[in-house]
Amino acid sequence: MSDYKDTLNLPKTSFSMKGNLANKEPMILNKWEKQGIYKKIREHFAGREKFVLHDGPPYANGSIHVGHAVNKILKDIIIKSKTLSGYDAPFTPTWDCHGLPIELQVEKKHGKAGQSISEDDFRKECRKYAKKQVEIQKKDFKRLGVLGDWEQPYLTMNFDYEANMIRTLAKIIENGHLSKGFKPVHWCTDCGSALAEAEVEYADKISPAIDVKFKIKDKDKLAQAFGLDSLNHDAFAIIWTTTPWTLPANQAIAVNNQLNYSLIKIEDFYIILAENLVEQTLKRYAIENAQIIATTTGDKLTGIIAEHPFYSRHVPILHGDHVTDDSGTGLVHTAPTHGVDDFTLGKEHNLSMEIFVKGNGCYSENTKLFAGEFIFKANDRIIELLGEKKRLMNSDKIKHSYPHCWRHKTPLMFRATPQWFISMEKQGLRNKALQAIKETSWAPSWGQARIEGMVKDRPDWCISRQRTWGVPLPLFIHKETEELHPNTIEILHKVAEKIEKGGIEAWFNADDCEFITETAQYKSVKDTLDVWFDSGSSSMCILDLDKRLSYPADLYLEGSDQHRGWFQTSLLVAMSAKGSQPYKEVFTHGFVVDEHGRKMSKSLGNVTSPQDIYNTLGADILRLWTASTDYKSEMAVSDQILKRTADTYRRLRNTARFLLSNLDGFNPATDIIEFDKLVKLDQWAIAKTKEFQDKIIEAYDKYQTHTVAQLIHHFCSIEMGSFYLDIIKDRQYTAKTDGHPRKSAQTAIYHIVHALVRWMAPILSFTADEIWDATPKTTDLPIQLCEWYTGLKSFDQDAELDLEYWAKIQEIRSEVNRVLEIKRNEDVVKASLEAEITIYADKDNYKLLEKLGNELRFLLISSKADLKVIEESTSSSIAANIPGLSIEITKIEEPKCERCWHRSSTVGDNPQYKDICSRCVENITTEAGESREFA
């Protein structure tokens, strides 16, 4: 037996079978660094239509987690796909660098600002810490294969950014949106500062729920209100509250004029409850022998005076629109300094706004009985005192949703303090923002309703904070009237110039006289700006000023929590400073959870870190998982899920390797065959690739990365792996090296590889770079500078063997393979090349198959295939799952060709080549080799 190995076209490529990504990717990154690849992209696409995806700044504190990785990878995929579409799509990373988390880290090492360390040195340490964190996170983002202007990122602590924030504030003030107010705001006792809406998260909390008796001072007036002559016992207005600690600040009781109220006799006293709540409230009190004496409307009760339950203080009953009879008692305890509705009612009726609680959460010295106590700890003492005073009607516990600090996870309080606000009403900001939301494209579409609801209901934006590490609110107010300095805008621009040279420290270290001359009349505000103002100003500080970018951004892409965060603050800053929305389109992705849908938590032990993934599996596996997951909802990840992703990756890599290995010796400059002259199956492969490319580009344009991933996988495993590549192996390996059949397949493979590597490039950035290096090409451009492949062709409309035709052939082939599997299990044949396949077909199917002539066997990967009419089918044939078709498979008895392994009666016909078939002899000995028309 001769050795025909040297006569075969064995596959050969530099593209390895194993990815070994964890080791290879850093080398590829190093290559990109040396090439200056991002700079080259910018130069190559300069002058093209821009596409700007504006990066929402992550916070510069700690290593990135998998949520950060998902966000940056999705952005990178979109940017790279837009580059392939020919856009100039720059990506400038940003970081959020001021605020409390950084202060807390610095405090751990150096102590509190102004105590163990000077405020100036504290800020220097904060700046140093933030810079270090940026470098740590930057390294991780780059390791993920994310391309961007990493050398010139935007940091909110950059001097020019800090200065431009002040200029943005000046525009907002100039446009009349700033207001000063004494209002209740969410206050964190741990932060020692007011919080913005975006910094508040709701969590379940168990609180005391008590019903408190307020004794009515004038019983005769109450009797009159209920249409009675007199009352012979004491009467009490009953309020229900879950915040006993606010009772020292109580100044009134609110009822609703439109509601009905009942006077109820219980033993030797009366109580007042909303009529609709009587039954459930008495049930809660476990009182059965109560008697409803009379009913009246809320407006008859207003003006009646009650007595505070433990202070000598008159408490009026007042009308409040916010009062309902859905729960509680229908009478609402009102502490003007501890609630928005309470505050509004207090302002309306000129109630006392005395402050009873300090910023640290302890009662102030003027709080009788409880001075110095921490408010939440005082709840029990207050309940105990109410019991002693016979003013406690009922005491219980309730589990309810309660506002917490997003950083400390501790309960918040509403606390009225003097603060600076961006008014939602003064210049119609709320309505303008709502209109801008309507003019923006939101995906998923429910995002629009979500942010609309938030903007409709949100209070004025409290932009002042009482922090050390933050951009100043550099205002000057009159010492007596507290009015803003008349030259505020001019002063702010002067401050901005100073900050641009020396950072925020230039303001904090300066004397007032450096900015104003009237220091006897005016004083500087010592507050800092809310950090959400920092990130919210990015459209003004970056997009509006950087000529490499554009305003508004084409796209904002962040987690779904940003409807209440960055999407909203960006909108409010842009609308109040510039009068237009900062984005055209807003996309959101879900949170990353484990395979059981649980949040990542160290305590649960279910944290998957991006560092672990790229150090073991490789960044491309993380990128493929990200792209493959429908990110509009929660994104589940685990070791098992990543293992499945790695399996998918291997299939994609193997497909690429097979394609590349069959391009050995192919020179695109000289070997490409025109479409019309290709073997018909190769024409199909190119047309099918074109069909998939159109779908893939459409999916990329819609940011549907999971659809892209599904299409690429289907293309590689089904259209290529299970059909085309399976069929052409014989032709590729055994045909004449430079003969038409092989060059035809190589031409198709060349086009397929050039399309496929571009489809993969946004997602599998490292692998695509590897594929590109191993691909024959006529360009020196790196893959990152390429656009979608234009060498593909579709069938003409009048093509006889079009995509529809080949789809039917694929169906028939699948049925043949099904029957083959049956015969394998029956030990009739071991492999398809041992099979003699007879297809019995009705008229329509016969017409389809006869076009392939004697090349049908190549499509079925068998040594012999016969086509007969259905009427000739035998009892041993098996009916196909296609009407009008049955299949018979028997073992072929002819000898095996030692070169192509086909069974053929022609083996040994040539005495010089006794162990190979005539087809192989032709491919070895003739100049042209065999000919193929269809497969």
UniProtKB/Swiss-Prot annotation:
Record's subcellular location: Cytoplasm
EC number from the UniProt entry: 6.1.1.5
Domain of life: Bacteria
The reaction(s) this protein catalyses: tRNA(Ile) + L-isoleucine + ATP = L-isoleucyl-tRNA(Ile) + AMP + diphosphate
Gene field: ileS
Complexes and interactors: Monomer.
GO molecular function: aminoacyl-tRNA deacylase activity; ATP binding; isoleucine-tRNA ligase activity; tRNA binding; zinc ion binding
Binding-site residues, ATP: 602
Record text on cofactor binding: Binds 1 zinc ion per subunit.
Name of protein: Isoleucine--tRNA ligase
Family label: Belongs to the class-I aminoacyl-tRNA synthetase family. IleS type 1 subfamily.
Binding-site list for Zn(2+): 897, 900, 917, 920
Record organism: Francisella tularensis subsp. novicida (strain U112)
InterPro entries given in the database record: aa-tRNA-synth_I_CS, aa-tRNA-synth_Ia, Anticodon_Ile_BEm, Ile-tRNA-ligase, Ile-tRNA-ligase_type1, Ile-tRNA_ligase, M/V/L/I-tRNA-synth_anticd-bd, Rossmann-like_a/b/a_fold
Cofactor: Zn(2+)
Chain positions recorded as L-isoleucyl-5'-AMP binding sites: 558
Motif ('HIGH' region): 58-68
